[in-house]
Amino acid sequence: MRQRLANGLPVASLLPVSTSLVECSLEERLEACRRLAVESLASPRRFWLREAGLLDWVRPPDEAFVGEMKQGDVSWFSGGLLNAAWNAVDRHAVASPERTALVWARPEGDVVSWSFRELRQASSRMAQVLLSQGVRWGDRVVGHLPETPTLAMLHLGCARIGAVPVAVPVRSGGTLGRVLRATRARVLVTADEAPLSEGRLPLWERVEDLLGGLGRVESVLVERRTGAPVSLVYGRDQELGTALVRARPTCALRPCDGEDPLLLVPGLEDGPPVVHGLAGFLLCAALGLREAAGIGPGAQVLCTEGFSGPRIDVLWGTWVLGGALVFDERGDGAHRPRALGVTHLFGPRGALAAAGPGVLGASLDGSDASVAPVWTPEGGGMLSARFGDLGGTSLFGVDPVLVDVMGRRAAGAGSEGELCVKRSWPAQPRSLEQDHAGYVAQRLERFPGLYRTGLRCRQLADGALATTGLTPLGGVAPSNVFPIEGPIGRA
């Protein structure tokens, strides 16, 4: 029987993850993914309730899926209770407290490593600070931060207490005001500047210019990243570092429903953030990374796109599996993967090519281990994956179809069209923040019975899908400022 904390959360209840998959051949990965994909469509209830065991639950779900897709009435693992911070960090801090959880590559040139124990303590401090600012379950907390451990602490600190973090990429400054208005957030976490390879971005100046017209923001926590001058407003602003030092390094975990929201910033889209279901997002992100990319304990993952947009699925999925993340604040990690201990590199082809021979087609030890996924534009993991020249497969629960502008199905090698999905899957976006009618109109109404992904794809001779572009959803560009398709290389 599992031990449990006072609040019902399990202690040291880690289920084994497929660490051997890290060394699997591409053929073995492709075979496993195809087998699981077929099973997920043939017996979805049995498949998803079994795979839900990858997560620790306070109360396991009784059903996998309830609802119908026509009006976006979609619910996965509802009634089940869990906590994302426990699944991502705390359970690893119990089982392997000194294992590396985070590697921070700083622009100053040094590299700092954090263990799961240290990350649990740091995220608990962040949670205590947020509680002191009046943040409670369901509250949205907006972050506008560089790729530092503070960004990780924000994601995890919110998750501990059931709040909803919304991270706005520092290169998407024009998005910040829109996100603050859409989420009605009262708390903003930012930094004085973001030191990037092309120079320093003045984040605080951007925030100051914006907050004058946003009276709803009551508290601004400011990280002193570079020491640039910051004029704090008494009663509203405070230095985050000082608050963290004063906070306790422990904080109770709040159980959350499987359908509690997880929000993603929609990149180029002019609309509100995209809403996901918490459990389905975590499970699909982790399952895809485990089976397609072979990530598990000991993996060290670098994502060149960062963790403030749709690829926070890489963040949550890697940590659920017990791997470590490289926060590449310098932005040159693809050029020095060995120095950072990178085992898995996520990014566009150009970044992977910069990593040196072997990353695109083979690893640095000479073995071929490249995977080319088609990512969902709005987070939640991979829709399908190609494994070198061996072929590809749709991934778990995804029943894809290509359609033309009239909704006619396209099939066969060389066919091209908009990628839609014929049934709900756990990582399907649930809504748009404060605009469910817009979600239904953009993604569900044009082709009844299908979910529009916003991707244009071509079917290859081996049956795999390759992304060819984007399709506007209801006249609005799909929500992904990052490259949709890109290989995963074993560095």
Residue spans of the language-model regions?
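Structural core segment of the AMP-binding/adenylate-forming
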Residues: L156, R160-G241, D332-A355, P487-R490
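A short helix-loop-beta submotif of the ANL/AMP-binding
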Residues: A127, R140, P146-V170, T183-V187, ...
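Conserved AMP-binding/adenylate-forming core of the ANL superfamily
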Residues: A85, L102-H155, S172-G177, R236-V245, ...
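Conserved AMP-binding/adenylation subdomain of ANL enzymes
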Residues: V164, G280-Q300, F307-H344, A385-G388
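Conserved pre-ATP/AMP-binding loop-to-beta segment of ANL
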Residues: E98-T100, L221-V222, G227-G271, H276-A286, ...
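Conserved ATP-binding/catalytic segment of the ANL
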Residues: C420-G489
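Gly/Ser/Thr-rich phosphate-binding loop
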Residues: L232-Y234, Q238-L244, V320-G323, P337-L390, ...
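AMP-dependent adenylate-forming
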Residues: L21-S25, F65-V66, A88-S115, G227-S231, ...
